[in-house]
Amino acid sequence: MSETPPSKAARWAGYVISAIPVIFMTIGGLFFLFFASEKVTEGMTKYGYPASAAKPILIAEIPCGLIYAIPQTATLGALLLTAYLGGAVATHVHAGEPFFFPIVFGVLVWLGLWLRDVRFRPLLPLRKP
């Protein structure tokens, strides 16, 4: 099956959209890990997690974003980010808070991948052929 590559505009739009979760997950995770650990610990206990869970969760968050950023492992990264964001949705639902943000992030993860890799188009068709 021959696949035509995505247009230049679609590929670049995919890279830009994909950069949003990568930046938030990796750079944000590193920032919170090294510079705002007290704030993260407070947030974790607010949601019912033990304070000791903050660092392992951040350490798990950072590689998910990095794996997604690498084209050869982007699919695995998208799956890992989806699982991570599913946990975020569950946490917000359990706390009775809005859970819109992690869902939007998940949509951005898959939309970015869909735009830059044509192999996902048959799996997630936006229109009938």
Regions found by a protein language model. Name each.
Residues 37-38, 60-62, 84:
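A generic alpha-helix surface/boundary motif
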Residues 49-69, 76:
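Core segments of alpha-helical transmembrane spans in multipass integral membrane proteins
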Residues 1-7, 46-56:
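Hydrophobic alpha-helical transmembrane segments
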